[in-house]
């Protein structure tokens, strides 16, 4: 378990202060996951699509971290198992950092495909959960952002209203500087 945790920390750039607690939880889950995998026992798969869509970086980091364990035991965990393992890591990240789920406002307009691409890139930037709300650009100009919004992002050029949380004009693909700025806002 220690190697798995160390690998996850190295890949994610985040550190757990209570490795023993995380190790115990992972050990318990992975023992059951190995048994389910070896005996082809399925689990509910409704959660996997949501995890893949909402936490793509967390899921990808978990897959990379656990690859050595899969190789060591000559197993391939299902997507469902991988999703549950990712949830364990995600929950510990939230607990460790005492971070709350960040609320992001995505300003929408006339290009839903572009807006979906911006949302996907946002979700790729952080391991932590995001709640993404949507607001029309014109409505944002009149009323600003709802309370509790940590970041406003839009693919459209728009002037700031009188008061607004930090606003980033996103041009895809997001540049390295924009990615760092967004990650800093979301993970602080």
What kind of region is each of these model predictions?
Residues 1-188:
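A cross-family "folded-core" feature that marks the main globular domain of proteins
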